Amino acid sequence: LMVVTSNADRICTGITSSNSPHVVKTATQGEVNVTGVIPLTTTPTKSHFANLKGTKTRGKLCPKCLNCTDLDVALGRPKCMGTIPSAKASILHEVKPVTSGCFPIMHDRTKIRQLPNLLRGYENIRLSTHNVINAETAPGGPYIVGTSGSCPNVTNGNGFFATMAWAVPKNNNNKTATNPLTVEVPFICTEGEDQITVWGFHSDSETQMVKLYGDSKPQKFTSSANGVTTHYVSQIGGFPKQAEDGGLPQSGRIVVDYMVQKSGKTGTITYQRGILLPQKVWCASGRSKVIKGSLPLIGEADCLHEKYGGLNKSKPYYTGEHAKAIGNCPIWVKTPLKLANGTKYRPPAKLLKERGFFGAIAGFLEGGWEGMIAGWHGYTSHGAHGVAVAADLKSTQEAINKITKNLNSLSELEVKNLQRLSGAMDELHNEILELDEKVDDLRADTISSQIELAVLLSNEGIINSEDEHLLALERKLKKMLGPSAVDIGNGCFETKHKCNQTCLDRIAAGTFNAGEFSLPTFDSLNITAASLNDDGLDNHTILLYYSTAASSLAVTLMIAIFIVYMVSRDNVSCSICL
């Protein structure tokens, strides 16, 4: 008799199961439950403004200039002269229209309120040590440089702004009306710097205009630099007396403007009576990013955000209010985003005894196996020992590396978009550095959609890569098992030996050696001879005789039936002779 011994177990590749699924969005599959996620967004809360980490942050233009507005510093008010520290980031903290505590200025006739903002846009700012024009000998002179009691100096004597010289005709001979005169404004800063030149003109009542300049008619003024030309006509009379910062009341007004001269470029000013000629100029270089905020600056932060203040970046993206931000900032997106950090969610697969082997294999592909500690992909063994599970850490690490690569790619996308957002702001450093909100919002919406699509595609790739990892596991398993197992499909192999938890752990660790496990012995035929005993026929012998007789009878009957069939078909003739 032949006896065959089977010790076969079945080993399959598989994916872990989880009882706490999360949901991610994908490009083609919609929302998919996965075993883990990496949140990519946060919703910040409002905080105070802070110094930007890793760089100098400028609050007031001149921190040591007490009781001075930034416009006072920018115009060179006598009591507000000081050093402006260098900075790569600046806070636009004066949100209301700001005046200067000196001679009354008609701020709304020019862009002069933007001058402090312009200066904030530079990293390095210094006031020249000498004057750009000799005001006393300028065309239309000689002049005396006028001062005012409403603009006291540090000794409380009469003074005036350091950036301008009030050119008053020196004697009665030149206190007359004049045709437009032109003066060149040379570039006196260092090569590579921008020169910001401040100038203006004085207007007063008809009586005062005649007294100071010999002409009561409106005067014309023009400035030109870098292809930008600006025209003004003075307004005569009709001003109520006004005092600034406790100074003497004044019936007159001054109009102040500025021009930006690029390195080596000359500017021109065409004027009549009442000119405020340029004197000391601002020399500026480098770029400092400007953002609206508030003082004081408390502590440090990764990012400064107009709506939320100082933020420390914990996620690459944020939801909530969109606004301008500078520094190492998250990018605004419309909806929360999550990156898949695991496998597609599968409920625990049913055991063999519940579904049968092939049913369990199908369930294994549809479901997952519990017990793969610290791993997403691995192996299961089915046999007399029950079900053993072991995680394959290498394939799990490869999956994690792919997710990390996706995360880094999204971070690179974030940096590029951040540069794109701030780039336009840098290019407008000669202006107030504010973009139209509608244009900015449209740009933000576009970038948000790009980022959301990138995350959807990343999730799609991560989830779809499960098949790739399982196929790699299957090839690895097949190579390790070698001739000790038979491939039965669906990522499963039937082994010719037992494979318990120890065996499975070695497979997962890549140290499996089939020779260490006992292979089964196959006896192709085990024949036991029958023998006659002295006691006569035993049961085995009787059974043998019975079998022989029954077989002979069956053969005889079959032959007889065949002959009868052939005769009936006339294929065989039968002759009987006596």
Curated annotation (Swiss-Prot):
Coiled coil spans: none
GO molecular function, one term: host cell surface receptor binding
Description of post-translational modifications: Palmitoylated.
Residue ranges that the UniProt entry lists as topological domain Extracellular: 1-546
Mode of membrane association: Single-pass type I membrane protein
Disulfide-bonded cysteines: 12-492, 68-80, 102-151, 499-503
Subunit structure: Homotrimer of disulfide-linked HA1-HA2.
Note: Major glycoprotein, comprises over 80% of the envelope proteins present in virus particle.
Record-given protein name: Hemagglutinin
Species of the source: Influenza B virus (strain B/Victoria/3/1985)
UniProt lineage: Viruses, Riboviria, Orthornavirae, Negarnaviricota, Polyploviricotina
